[in-house]
A protein has these predicted regions:
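Glycine-rich, aromatic-bearing surface loops/beta-hairpins
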Residues: 128-217
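Generic helix N-cap/helix-start motif at coil->alpha-helix transitions
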Residues: 11-19
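Amphipathic alpha-helical segments of tetratricopeptide repeats
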Residues: 42-43, 82-86, 177
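Extended amphipathic alpha-helical interaction segments
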Residues: 82-162
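Solenoid-like repeat scaffolds
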Residues: 4-12, 40-47
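Short, charge-rich amphipathic alpha-helical segments embedded
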Residues: 36-66
């Protein structure tokens, strides 16, 4: 299982904090700050070297920047997302093309649905996590739902704020930060539980495995 080898050791509170700061930088049009935070977040989650974190972030930023200016034909950004994820050292059995599709999809649903996109974005994020971590969708559904909800809270808050996306956002950013922290805690818990199950199976003796098979109806 992927969780035993890749991206299993991140600090969920730190990752939530970094993503909150990334979103603020994105909406406040601070590209240099956004890139620096993305490099930190990639390194924190994937555990890769600084050169790989930077290279992967360059490709993911290129895709995100292109998407932000686009009005259609969004699939053309998938190749850069694929290359970006490939730099992060995902295991060979992970379908990186599928990972990129799910990553891009949650960007697209927010663009197409608008302020009510939280649930649809959460579904796409759930698919993304299931593909990356090789876990059943139901294990990571809560993490996906909460991150999608965080995006909707941000979008609705900014829409209602007289200062728009570039303002302080005191009415909504604290809730966004809380949802992202809770989302990453849920994801980390799902990864840890999945890894523990795999280790438990690996530690079983042949006799125990045979007994389990015989006990299965």
């Amino acid at each position: 299982m992927t969780a035993r080898h890749w991206g299993a050791a991140f600090d969920p509170d730190e990752l939530g904090r970094l993503e909150t700061r990334m979103w603020k930088a994105y909406y406040r049009k601070q590209p240099a700050r956004l890139f620096g935070l993305l490099v930190q977040a990639v390194r924190a989650q994937a555990g890769v070297s600084w050169p790989r974190a930077i290279a992967g972030s360059v490709l993911l930023t290129k895709a995100a920047a292109g998407f932000s200016r686009a009005t259609g034909d969004y699939e053309r950004f998938a190749p850069d997302i694929v290359r970006g994820y490939r730099m992060l050292g995902l295991p060979e059995h992970v379908d990186i093309e599928a990972v990129a599709r799910h990553e891009l999809r949650w960007w697209v649903v927010r663009r197409e649905i608008g302020l009510a996109a939280g649930a649809a974005a959460g579904e796409s994020i759930t698919d993304l996590y299931a593909a990356i971590y090789d876990l059943p969708r139901e294990r990571v559904a809560e993490a996906g739902r909460l991150r999608g909800l965080a995006a909707e809270v941000r979008d609705r808050g900014a829409a209602a704020d007289p200062d728009g996306s570039t303002g302080r956002g005191a009415a909504y950013w604290p809730e966004v930060a809380r949802l992202l922290r809770t989302s990453y805690r849920s994801l980390r818990r799902a990864i840890d539980e999945g890894a523990a199950e795999v280790e438990g199976v690996a530690d079983e003796t042949p006799a125990q495995r045979d007994a389990s098979v015989r006990a299965t109806p």
